[in-house]
Amino acid sequence: VVLQSFKDKIGISIMMENITVYDDILSPSDTSKYAEMIFGTCPFFYGEVDNESTPPTGMVCDFTDMGEHIYPEIKTLLNTLLNKIYEKQPTLKDTQLYRIYVNLFTPNENPYFHIDGEKTITCLYYLNPQLSYDEGGETQFIVDEDIKVVCSKPGRLVVFDGEIQHRATSFRHYPRLTLAYKFLIPQ
């Protein structure tokens, strides 16, 4: 009941069930600049799993506990995007931001469907350089036994209920970078 009332309060049912999409959160040049910076400077680690029963896919750079070890320009990006998230979804200020990280998938990886957790709101920001439907790279959601897709348009922010089963898809020819913010809904 608390979770549903919170979902109703923040109104994340605009595009499809509990998923909202915002375009042009940052300019294309800023998105490209930050993508290059993250790709070139962040320490990515292999080993993150989507479920306990699946092997690892992709790599992760987790900013959550990096503190002073984050480059100032990247810290600016993280704070700018967080402010944009709060601007679009003001009631997320009443939640606990518990994780910020970047997913990196190399071409033709095949991630698994998963949930992010109970009472979680997830925000994804697409840092890829371009949108090409033939390349793939979308986020897939299982909604009412169908797969719904949000294309990974550069500069796009998608906000969704972390209990929705979803997965990234990789691109065919270039890496896929997605910045993720995860919020815990209060009890």
Language-model features: locations:
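Catalytic core of non-heme Fe(II) oxygenases with the double-stranded beta-helix
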Residues: K75, N79, N83-Q187
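Non-heme Fe(II)/2-oxoglutarate
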Residues: F6, I10-D94
